[in-house]
Amino acid sequence: MSDAFTIYLRNEESVLLMQRADGVADFPGAWDGIYGIGDPEDLDAVVARITEVTGIEAENLQFVRSGDARGLAFGNRLNDVTPMLFVSSVNEVDARGLYKSFEWVDPGNIGTKEYATPQLSDMYGDVASYLYILKTSIGQEQNVAKEIQARLSGTGSLKDIQDEIYGVLSPHFMRGYIFVEASALHHVEKLIGRVGVSTTPMKNLSLIHI
């Protein structure tokens, strides 16, 4: 079982990177997610770690998914680290503890950091590769989510992708955004009517590529 985790925190279309303090033992000054030691299945402890180093309170956070642990080299040690994905309703951060600064970045730019903790970009891919973000009008999130669920529960042309859509998440605090977990992009595109001719396109909805 993994005894450590790295959290990737998303706010709308950006992901949070934290820069380690200069005086820490491992990777001083390196860019990181939010690193913590402990059981990644203990979500209360994981959320407490986020609050500890960012100041973001639990009511502004929602867990999305975790990936398989990776063995990462920390000096002469090999640590099993589990990547985890959360969404946040706020982007105000107070970097403290292990970290000295922070930056909200486009997910595609994670790999451009010259000095980062091991496999930082790859681990983000482990938790984000099957997550797709839909942007809609503020106030219409629940209606759109219900329409998506209704499409999935039918017996028509979308029946063949029902097993490919794993979940639809509409965090109450993320105004204007819906998260869809699916096995591939083209299934989401079919679901919302962006490919093919058999599905009516959903209005006021755009797909954000992450």
Protein language model features and the residues they cover:
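Active-site segment of metal-dependent pyrophosphate-handling enzymes
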Residues: 51, 55-92
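Short, charged/polar surface micro-motifs in flexible loops or helix N-caps
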Residues: 10-15, 23-24, 69, 89-93, ...
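Short beta-strand micro-motifs in enzyme catalytic cores
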Residues: 3, 77-86, 103, 130-132, ...
